[in-house]
């Protein structure tokens, strides 16, 4: 397979952005003021290519160097160890971004300057930022190798370097407030102590906050909708509490009266059947009121019948008058015969005895 031909480009941009984002490459087609590139018609970058550059930088898993006047490249050309190059700053994939609006177009980086470089830029000692990147035969940048502070720009019309006095230098190791760490944790973003907040984490926290605001708005709308609905009570489904309480009170009274009647009936029945005696009537009434009619009935049903009590309480014994001695006992037919004869029953009985 034919190897893809790549070349190395060095371009320069002015440092002017007050928010820390510095233009590294312009949007669209561009060339260097020295006539480069000579092997392709021009270089070209758009949003898609920029995202590929950011992806490549993230795969490095380390910071990219910003040196002074491409000292790293110059030493490499001379065969000198580049390990002694002084860094002016550093940046990573989270500090590379594509802009395309009215004020900014192109690829931007947000370097973390060393204290020395920060002061030099602030004092105007350096004004431009130069990019180093390999490109293919179509002039498409393949990755960002590094950048450099310089006063010899590769292209014209780029933005100048600028810093704000409020810009924080990472060398100062400013600690994130504990309250901010807790707030971010509530939004689902955990930040370890001493670790800086990345752009991705900040966007995650912002999205979580926007979601909470959206949910609150929906909840407020639902409350307003429910409040606006007709709240009149359907009397076919509900009754006033006072009415309910009065009805339940009457039911309780009627139930108590009914229970008393049933208790008396059960006790009376038990006495008639020989299962209870007069002496325990009051006890049985109290038992029924306390334990219920069903419990009283079950208890009395289990009791055996006492024959003596049953006979005394439920049967009436008819005592016949003793018949006078010597007087026959008349049957109903005899009594009717005496009546027809016009004599008394005693006389008729005597006649029967005489016969």
UniProtKB/Swiss-Prot annotation:
Pfam families, per the entry: Mu-like_Pro
Keyword Oxidoreductase: no
InterPro entries xrefs: Phage_Mu_Gp1 (IPR012106)
Gene Ontology molecular function: peptidase activity
Keyword annotations of the record: Hydrolase, Protease
Domain of life per record: Bacteria
Record-level GO BP terms: proteolysis
Function comment: Potential protease involved in virion morphogenesis.
Record-stated family: Belongs to the peptidase U35 family.
Name this polypeptide is given: Mu-like prophage FluMu I protein
């Amino acid at each position: 397979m034919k190897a893809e031909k790549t070349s190395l480009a060095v371009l320069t941009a002015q440092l002017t952005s007050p928010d820390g984002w510095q233009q590294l490459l312009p949007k669209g087609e561009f060339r260097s003021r020295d006539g480069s590139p000579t092997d392709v018609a021009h270089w070209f970058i758009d949003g898609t290519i920029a995202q590929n550059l950011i992806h490549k930088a993230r795969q490095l898993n380390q910071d990219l160097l910003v040196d002074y006047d491409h000292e790293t490249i110059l030493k490499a050309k001379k065969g000198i160890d580049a390990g002694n190059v002084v860094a002016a700053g550093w940046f990573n994939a989270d500090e590379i971004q594509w802009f395309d609006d009215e004020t900014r177009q192109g690829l931007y980086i947000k370097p973390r300057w060393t204290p020395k470089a920060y002061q030099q830029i602030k004092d105007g000692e350096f004004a431009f930022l130069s990019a180093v990147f390999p490109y293919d035969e179509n002039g498409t940048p393949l990755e960002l190798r590094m950048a450099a502070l310089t006063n010899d720009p590769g292209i014209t019309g780029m933005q100048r370097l600028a810093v704000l006095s409020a810009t924080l230098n990472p060398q100062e190791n400013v600690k994130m407030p504990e309250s901010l760490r807790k707030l971010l944790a509530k939004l689902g973003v955990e930040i370890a102590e001493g670790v800086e907040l990345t752009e991705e984490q900040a966007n995650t926290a912002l999205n979580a906050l926007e979601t909470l605001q959206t949910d609150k708005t929906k909840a407020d709308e639902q409350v307003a909708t429910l409040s606006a609905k007709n709240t009149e009570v359907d009397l076919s489904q509900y009754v006033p509490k006072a009415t309910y309480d009065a009805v339940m009170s009457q039911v309780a009274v009627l139930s108590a009266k009914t229970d008393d009647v049933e208790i008396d009936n059960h006790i009376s029945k038990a006495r008639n059947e020989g299962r209870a005696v007069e002496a325990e009537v009051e006890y049985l009434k109290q038992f029924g009121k306390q334990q219920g009619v069903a419990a009283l009935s079950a208890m009395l049903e289990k009791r055996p019948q006492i024959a003596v009590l049953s006979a005394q309480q439920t049967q009436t014994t008819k005592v016949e008058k003793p018949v006078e001695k010597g007087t026959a006992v008349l049957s109903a037919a005899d009594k009717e015969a005496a009546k027809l004869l016009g004599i008394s029953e005693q006389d008729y009985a005597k006649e029967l005895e005489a016969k």
